[in-house]
């Protein structure tokens, strides 16, 4: 009696699984990645087709292409590199944020701020790094913790602004 019920359940479940797979594969047939790079005050990219986007995730550096597996990633301070369909590469320094890849080859990158390399002065970065290193040695735990965060951001920024 139970084996008949199991067989009936398996038989009923199979078509649903096939339909779900078939629907997902049809949705993911897009050739280009659509990027939205949004800040609270502006959208740098709004549903623009691009070839690839490299993001600084807390899990490591990720290269996102069309048909990438859906994911949500927390971003650390670093460089978002956008390779456009014409082959041109644009880079933006972000202080952190989140990236979401949807099943339909859509990538949303949300950050508080994003800047291009020419927006930074290497001298100012060195000066701020020296000040943050001094503050990291502070006896005040709050000041030291804040300085450690500043150092992480400034280190990533120094590599970007070279």
Swiss-Prot record:
What InterPro entries is this protein classified in?
Answer: ATP_synth_F1_dsu/esu, ATP_synth_F1_dsu/esu_N, ATPD_C_fung, ATPsynth_dsu/esu_N
- Asked if the record carries the keyword Cytoplasm, the reply is no
List localization entries: Mitochondrion inner membrane
Its predominant location is mitochondrion
Transit peptide extent? 1-24
Task: Provide the function of this protein.
Answer: Mitochondrial membrane ATP synthase (F(1)F(0) ATP synthase or Complex V) produces ATP from ADP in the presence of a proton gradient across the membrane which is generated by electron transport complexes of the respiratory chain. F-type ATP synthases consist of two structural domains, F(1) - containing the extramembraneous catalytic core, and F(0) - containing the membrane proton channel, linked together by a central stalk and a peripheral stalk.
| Family per similarity comment | Belongs to the ATPase epsilon chain family.
- Protein name (Swiss-Prot/TrEMBL): ATP synthase subunit delta, mitochondrial
Biological classification of the source: Eukaryota, Fungi, Dikarya, Ascomycota, Saccharomycotina
Gene assigned in the entry: ATP16
